[in-house]
């Protein structure tokens, strides 16, 4: 039985044990579901929902803390937990939207126009929490969520309520916000390619934006060409804002708004400069908690999303067939090395071996490809074969959904040994023949659904790689497996040879001399430039050392 009086609701919630978050979440969901389908006066419903806020926020935060670091596919229990968090946020949003609808045209709204600001802000808040939760666990967000977000903001603009202060008292802290700030926070997160962010980073960016989204402005289009840091919001589109450099046509002006984030872009650049200069992240007013290097990498990713148009560089075509995939550097090394266990060389004779010109120049830059692709809503079942298990390494079979010159969208059903995260290195084999070449790739985008189906957008790093052994030169350091990627020269890009090894395998690799061992050949090199660092790997360009230098 759901209580429909404020004090009775308060008493029931005070007696509800939150020790078991899953049980408490189920009780809260059932009660909210019934409440939202019960006739109540708007004022009474709003007061009851305000009482629900703290227990709902507490339970969802507890469940999310257990979900945030799990690879895909999630276990069945974790998928149930993820679903209940999503539905709790949805029901809270439904409740506050019901208040807004009940107030529309009422005497209370006519006399106390600003009273509508609170339920609009709260509905936006929980729709935003629904979205960030889906990004956090890489699950698809429900259809029409973005359309509801835009509609609430448009309604607030009609009532001239978008800048009215709204009180907040929750785990966010006490203070005030506004509908425009809340809407900007949601839109800016949607512009970060959130399904491409490493695990846990969507929530960190969301928290950062809670403090700094007020620096963004939302304007009616002026007709001029869009500037850097400006984004187009189509209020009638079920999707996040888009990067657009074209002027808004007269026919679209009524339904389009311009999100001007240029000031926030400059603020983010200033944080990057201060972190690069060695200031601790804990001493900067970021509004979110992260380690120094992790903060720097996060802000660089955010800046790439906001400051540059992330246009797809290659046309994509529908894929066909299956590929074999192994996940992780050690696994990629194992299968490319003929499934031989990694054994450090017993004796190394240092000799210089010319394995190619590294050709590094200061102008070389890593190219980032956008694979922000939606999951197709077809009913075709992806193929998945049983894992091939040896020494805890696995091969799984993935369907090629589409592909381009530089990447692919792959889909598979959960299988033993399948654990994948954004930023993981993959080995991909296009032919099932035992001697077929393995291609190196990195997971750029990740999404999974409630049925255990996983989709990954991958960037191909090269057409092949060589499994090698690496250690600090002239020392007794531990031998590490690594992947040696060949140079690439095309009309569009010029990339020298590079090494890929596990993150943290070498402390400050840029200042080290490394020995690359391939069979009985040894090559002494010096890392020159960090190309990329993800949560699981580091990729560096390097130059060969002359014999006198080594």
Feature map (PLM): residue ranges:
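Context-gated lysine
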Residues: 41, 47, 83, 97, ...
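Short strand-loop-strand
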Residues: 298-299, 305-437, 445-550
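Intrinsically disordered, low-complexity regions
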Residues: 10-13, 25, 29, 233, ...
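Generic N-terminal leader/targeting and pre-domain segments
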Residues: 1-163
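Extended, domain-scale alpha-helical bundle/helix-rich regions
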Residues: 161-349
